[in-house]
Amino acid sequence: MKASSDSKGDIVSPYSSGPIENETRGECHPISAKGGQPEKENKVSLELTEEIIQSMEVGMAVRDYSGRISSMDFHRTSTYLVTASADESIRLYDVANATCLKTINSKKYGVDLVCFTSHPTTVIYSSKNGWDESLRLLSLNDNKYLRYFKGHHDRVVSVCLCCRQECFISGSLDRTVLLWDQRADKCQGLLHVQGRPATAYDDQGLVFAVAFDGCIRMFDARSYEKGPFEIFSVGGDMSDVNVVKFSNDGRLMLLTTKDGHIYVLDSFRGTRLATFNVKPVLSDATLEASFSPEGMFVISGSGDGNVYAWSVRSGKEVRLANFVL
């Protein structure tokens, strides 16, 4: 889940100096390509219930940054977490060991959004300097840019990778959505939109969604040039869309807006199943919300600095009594 919180915790990680490559400076512990996981892993199946949600506590806190966290992403198969901060840094953490593995500074370009590729030590990130809106494919192992993706002409506000293929999608305030292949410099597709776009792939990589102006447009990834095959409305809410996401099983979608609304929809019929409300975030921040792994709960940040959770089935808030920021 990405976040817009500037709250700070109580663990400061030690660093050792690293090399300078392509303007990014790194300080790190050695990085394992396996993402900190042992070769043989014992996995436990756990049914997530309201009682378990209510009993959750903060397990790791960090304060090794000097600006608001603008974006963060968990790797799908490793124990790694990557963050982007307003202090123009990218940080890689191993959450299983509560360790910061690497800090990379991007003073020249700034950093706004960041997300993992399929590899746990490679990320794609967007700039925040106001003059270069390129996306960059960065190796965290050696702090080297592997590829630049040029095409947007204003701030990139949405980036989503396809977990099944080496492709991703980005949306910008220049009112374009671009489709990319990580192996190519030039975009593979272009869509013009009429507002601030939010983008998302489903878990199978067969469908992607583009949301703006109170509607979610559904595209077949194999024939997107034909236009959307479905358009879902969230009921007249025309405020700027912040994020759109699919649940892991693809059955549900959520959409957040600048005004603090969170909508949950059936991704097949477009039926609105629930609406949750939080205090709006700052004008330059993003209201981020996510489904729990099985899709039964929604967890979101808020402009009041708190984290909230709701049951999708009942629509009721699940109190996070032990979750104090």
Q: Model features per residue range: what roles?
A:
Residues 2-325:
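WD40-repeat beta-propeller superdomains and closely related acidic/aromatic-rich repeat-like regions
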